[in-house]
């Protein structure tokens, strides 16, 4: 229930963010939390690159081990993305007139979250950056990186 509580808190704090079905999307993330994982920060948005597509709401949870992105399908099934610290490359924030976008660049793909209240962007950037920096420090560098 920590994910849903934090998602609702985020939505209340930043009401211009477009997000639907917070409970069902939060349940996807809750289902995949490991017993030793704790939720540090949660935000919501649309997992797409288009401001006019408002039907792909997801809940993004930053834990003490990874970033989880949960989306519940309308009829059946769900989708979950997980970003481990070693997969994380970069973070890009774009602010528009009303909404903003957050792009998490990973080794495999770019994850874009849109229709987020632009007032929330600095808070999201701070939480993702600080979490990923702290988590990356825990992973030892490979021999290839040391050369």
Residue ranges of each PLM-predicted region?
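Small-side-chain structural scaffolding
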Residues: 45, 61-63, 100, 131
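Acidic, Ser/Thr- and proline-rich intrinsically disordered linker/docking segments
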Residues: 1-22, 26-34, 52-53, 73-147
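The phosphoinositide-binding surface of pleckstrin homology
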Residues: 37-52
């Amino acid at each position: 229930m920590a994910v849903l509580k934090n998602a609702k808190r985020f939505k209340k704090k930043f009401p211009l963010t477009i997000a639907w079905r917070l409970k069902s999307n939060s349940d996807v993330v809750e289902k995949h939390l490991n017993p030793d994982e704790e939720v540090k920060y949660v935000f919501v948005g649309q997992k797409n690159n288009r401001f006019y597509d408002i039907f792909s709401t997801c809940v993004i949870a930053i834990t003490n081990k990874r970033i989880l992105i949960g989306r519940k399908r309308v009829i059946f099934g769900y989708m979950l993305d997980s970003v481990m610290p070693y997969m994380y490359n970069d973070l890009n924030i774009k602010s528009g007139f009303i909404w903003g976008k957050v792009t998490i660049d990973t080794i495999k793909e770019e994850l874009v979250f849109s229709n987020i209240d632009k007032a929330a962007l600095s808070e999201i950037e701070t939480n993702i950056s600080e979490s990923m920096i702290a988590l990356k420090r825990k992973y030892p560098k490979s021999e290839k990186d040391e050369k």
